[in-house]
């Protein structure tokens, strides 16, 4: 895998420097398949993506990275924050188009209204049978996963962006990860993270201050920060 360390951003760069999509995995060509290529053409670097009639808050680099990571993920995928189901649709479509279409996306969303809206989009796209919807607080669902030793090879975090919520997630995420898993944080590269008066955003600082040593920086793309899970750095790792 490519670590793309040259694309990392400093706190001063947040919301000022957006890196385009760069591949994490090795493959022939610029994109993994025709759907990935079409996604690249769906918006410019400054425009939010719409995918199959679903809108949201993804830049094209975010969407391309999600598709690539899900396409090559070897196990199930966890999404924390469904909203209207845009990123969920990208993840599940990538899985359907991959060589491992039996994998599942578990998506967590506290708003039942948002879950139903997302579910209707996914039914229309015929990807709903690859998605488990969890309409509960993320803390409850993650506790259940921990108790059952559920593991994921890819996690996309796009829920509560506050410092406290991100810290809480970082404290519980290692137990959910397979060795070599990737964790993608949305709104990691966002200028609102530097505004001390904006208590709704603190993703970057929370990761800088409290990410476990096992989460290694692996690049930034659009608004997203990517991290690789190195289980050798987790003294409490249980397979």
PLM region descriptions:
Residues 1-156, 160-239:
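A short alpha-helical cap/connector motif
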């Amino acid at each position: 895998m490519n670590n793309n360390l040259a694309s990392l951003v400093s706190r001063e760069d947040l919301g000022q420097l957006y890196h385009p999509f760069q591949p994490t995995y090795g493959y022939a060509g610029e994109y993994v398949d025709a759907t990935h290529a079409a996604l690249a053409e769906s918006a410019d670097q400054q425009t939010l993506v719409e995918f199959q009639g679903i809108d949201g808050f993804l830049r094209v680099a975010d969407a391309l990275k999600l598709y690539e990571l899900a396409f090559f993920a070897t196990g199930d995928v966890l999404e924390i924050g469904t909203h209207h189901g845009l990123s969920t649709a990208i993840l599940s479509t990538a899985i359907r188009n991959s060589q491992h279409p039996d994998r599942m996306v578990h998506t967590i969303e506290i708003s039942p209204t948002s879950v139903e809206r997302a579910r209707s989009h996914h039914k229309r796209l015929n990807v709903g049978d690859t998605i488990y919807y969890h309409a509960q607080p993320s803390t409850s669902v993650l506790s259940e996963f921990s108790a059952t030793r559920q593991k994921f090879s890819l996690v996309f975090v796009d829920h509560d962006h506050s410092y406290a919520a991100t810290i809480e997630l970082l404290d519980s995420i290692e137990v959910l990860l397979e060795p070599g898993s990737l964790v993608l944080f949305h709104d990691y590269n966002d200028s609102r993270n530097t505004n001390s008066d904006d208590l709704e955003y603190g993703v970057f600082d929370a990761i800088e201050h409290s990410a476990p040593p096992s989460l290694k920086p692996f690049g930034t793309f659009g608004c997203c920060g990517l991290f690789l899970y190195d289980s050798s750095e987790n003294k409490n790792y249980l397979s």
